[in-house]
Amino acid sequence: MSTTLIKGGTVVSATGRVAADVLVDGARIVAVLEPGSTALGHDLASTVDAVIDATGKYVIPGGIDAHTHMQLPFGGTFASDTFETGTAAAAWGGTTSIIDFAVQRTGEKVQDGLAHWHELAAGNCHVDYGFHQIIGGVDEDSLAALPKLIDEGITSFKMFMAYPGVFYSDDAQILKAMQISADTGLMTMMHAENGPVIDVLAEQLVKQGKIEPYYHGIARAWQAEEEATHRAIMLSHLTGAPLYVVHVSAKQAVAQLATARDNGQNVFGETCPQYLYMSLEEQLGAMSDEWGGFEGAKYVCSTPLRSREEGHQDHMWQALRTNDLQMVSTDHCPFCMKDQKELGKGDFRAIPNGIGSIEHRMDLMYQGVVTGQITLERWVELTSTTPARMFGLYGTKGVIQPGADADIVVYDPNGHTSIGVDKTHHMNMDHSAWEGYEIDGHVDVVISRGTVLVSDGEFHGTKGHGSFLKRGLSQYLI
Ligand code: URP
Ligand code: ZN
Ligand code: ZN
């Protein structure tokens, strides 16, 4: 086993920052020491196998992206990142664990969907990975399978109030699944949008000839998000199920979550970088360009981008500060323009939903520190510590302390990152919704369980290094 000393940096946690050296032995952190400590009677730097100089830099726990979709089947195609390409991109961006979504659809057995996801990921990942379980078909069989997931290390499942005919669950199905969630402690994750209402609005728009990507966001009105969020909260209240609402983008949905939390409910919410930075107005602007009005397809995701005029983006930042929202995940769901997004050229409903961001989450959220939206500590909390606690990984992940996995990022606040397909892009996509974003900060070194994956602008990872994470129940419940 080899030893590494990360020396001279500022160790940042969710609760504070301290000048300290971090000693790694094999895959674990074994000590957090006073800078230059000679507590053991000698200068550690001269006896360890490797020294990483972190002078002037932040030393943070590796990012945990708790919402990704590698190879997700959607709209007649598949998300374009494999577990291999997507986890390499994650590592480049300072994310050392992901939680992806195994898929079960109507008529399929949960166990089969899960086994398939294990096949896709095993031996292919560069960073550690866990799974949530999508229940796309709630029936007696899938309900019976839910409690058994806990022994498999899968302690959360997602249902959809959107996408009728695909992944959709009605209220009766949701109620039954939530009763099991309440009994077992499994976290219910919810895609909270009123799908039937959205589908009618979308059909009406298309009939009026409004077929461009921008109308995706018009059909998916914030009222549909607020209403579904409220309904999910009420069903969680009725059953006692812990509820985690994914990809929140409407300020009205945040207000629903805040009220429920004020009432003492175990209700949580995540947002994603796109809802902090991008807007419906930008998507409108992309209607008249070289793509013939279609460039807005790169912004098509659900929930959709919201109007900046209505102030949703500022409200999301505020909710992150006040803990009305607890986490930032990417909902990484990449599709290329060519042959994928293009499927919806004549009808926005056929555009596969999703944006690729796994590589940029740590940088984009650090930009919130630079602009004063969040503190340094909150950056770590939102991107690593809370994801670990929320999804049963805390202690081994999400923190720099003795005994934890040595998942560590050395982040240079004086570095710079220019995001662009030809610059810093390792995701398997032919475009980036983040093209042209400039970040004051840089992911310098990325370590996963003691192994350096990225340093000096070079990738040293090997596929298969990433291990499956058997998760415990949430450590975040009140
Ligand atoms: O646009 C999105 N979010 N695509 C992925 C599927 C989902 O609903 O998370
Ligand atoms: Zn969703
Ligand atoms: Zn998603």
Residue ranges of predicted features:
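N-terminal metal-binding scaffold of metallo-dependent hydrolase/deaminase domains
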Residues: 1-46
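C-terminal cap of metal-dependent C-N hydrolases
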Residues: 342-347, 353, 402-469
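Alpha-helix-loop-beta-strand connector modules within alpha/beta enzyme cores
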Residues: 111-127, 175-190
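His/Asp/Glu-enriched, well-ordered alpha-helical/loop segment
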Residues: 210-240, 292, 296-299, 322-328, ...
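Histidine/acidic residue-rich metal-binding segments in metalloenzymes
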Residues: 141-328, 344
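Divalent metal-coordination and catalytic microenvironments
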Residues: 9, 27, 56, 67, ...
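Short catalytic-loop micro-motif centered on adjacent basic/acidic residues
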Residues: 99-100, 130-133, 242-247
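Metal-associated gating/positioning segment near the N- to mid-region
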Residues: 45, 54-124, 141
